[in-house]
Structure formats: C-alpha cells, structure tokens
Amino acid sequence: MPTATADRKLTAKDFQVPFPNDWCPGCGDFGILNAIQQAFAKLELEAHKVAVVGGIGCSGKAPYFFPTYGVHTLHGRLLPFAHGIKLANPEMTVVGVGGDGDGLGIGAGHFVNSGRRNLDMTYILFNNEVYGLTKGQAAPTLAMGLQPKSLPEPNIQGQLNSLMMAMSVGFTWIGRGYSYNVKKVVDLVVEAIQHPGLSFLDILQPCPTYNNLHTKDWYAGKDLNSGQPRIYWLDDTDYDPVIPPDADEAAALGKMNEFLSKVHELSLIHI
C-alpha cells in the first residue's frame, strides 16, 4: 500500500482502484467519491488503517472504489457494521457512506442510536432525495407534494431534516456540502474525520436520471429571476457554529438556536 514519505505526498490516485464504475453520467456520487479520496490523501491515511462501510443503493457501491478495507452491508445496517469495526479496531479510521433512503428510511433507528453512542467515526450521507438504484422512489428527504419524473403521483409523506435529526440524537460534528463543489467537500470530509467523536456530513447531490426537480441548474438558481444560486457557504459569512468545551448553558443554547435558524431556512440552502 502506498504511504507518504519525506519525498512523496499521497494523492487521490493512491486511493483509487482500477474497477469499472456504472454510476450514471453526471451522478453526484462521482464528486463525493473523488472528494473522499482526496481527503484521505490530504490526511495521509494509510489504506490498511481505513475502513469504508457502505449500505445499499448506488452509494452503497462506494467501498469497492477504495484500496482500503471495505464492507458492503445490508439495507439500512451500515452504521452497526461500522460501530463493530470501530469497537474492535479503535485505531482504525472508519467512514460510513450511504444514501438518504438507506440511512433515514429503514436505517433511521440505527441513525438515532449512533448519536447516543458517539463513537469516533464519520458518517457521510449521499442526499439526492430518491432511491436511485430502484428507479427513483421518494426518499425520506423528498418534500411532501413534490413529484420528480420517477413518481406517478406527488410525494404524500413528510420530509425528514437530516441535520435536525443529527443534532437531536447527539452527533457532535454536523456539516453539509454539495457534490458538485468537490474542493469544499474535501475540506468538510477532512474536518469530519479529524473530529474526535461522531461526525455527520450531509452532501446534497443531483440525480440526473430520476430527480428532474433539483438539478445542477436548480441548485445554481438558473430558474430564478435573480439568477442567485440557491446554495451559499457559511464560510463566507460571520457565522461561527462551534460550541466551545467551556461554554455555559446559555451560550450553548444560543449556538443551538443559531443552528436551528440556519437549518430551517427555505429560500436558500446553507452549506
């Protein structure tokens, strides 16, 4: 396995494998995969000390594309597998990668209990609002009333807010990225892995095959008269999300209220 030396830095290519990839052209999964590979290189991780754990669906194939340890698990069960790996091998870097349907549908119970345990690992959610591998059914992240082309009728169920869920059940680092901005996602993955506790990274992504509503152009705001992108980056504002370890209760609650105000913004999407 390649390792960093004084004369050679690791690159994303060191975390790639020569296996064919059948994701659809334009799929956001490619950007997320590339960002994780770059993050591993930036952190100078040793491949034999990393485990990538996937669920089902398109994103569940991700572990096959790393020269690390990898597990392709059962529907909604990637987090228990990841917990077992971390508990048995505390020195390993464990990264869970799964879709919004996998993690917030049948896997929602494990999502909740993961927060309670707060193990030192990272969970990356591929959020495209549909079950891509099984022809585009509504995922728990799709808002009620929306009807992408894959649905015969508008979605009749309410939308789950993954960031709210993560905060309420105990994840200690929470972030959001956008798959078409790989550079930003690399930084988020690095920060999530470096966090000494349970980190959750929600990555918004288009599904060009089944979700014709929230496309690359939609995120870019090309349908708006203003032409303003729907995404903005908190790094470009004065928002400070960190709750210091010595913060008193009032200060911590103030930070949490700031977080809640960002999570519930409707006109723009914070990243």
Predicted segments, located by residue:
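Conserved small/polar residues in nucleotide/adenosyl-binding loops
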Residues: 269-271
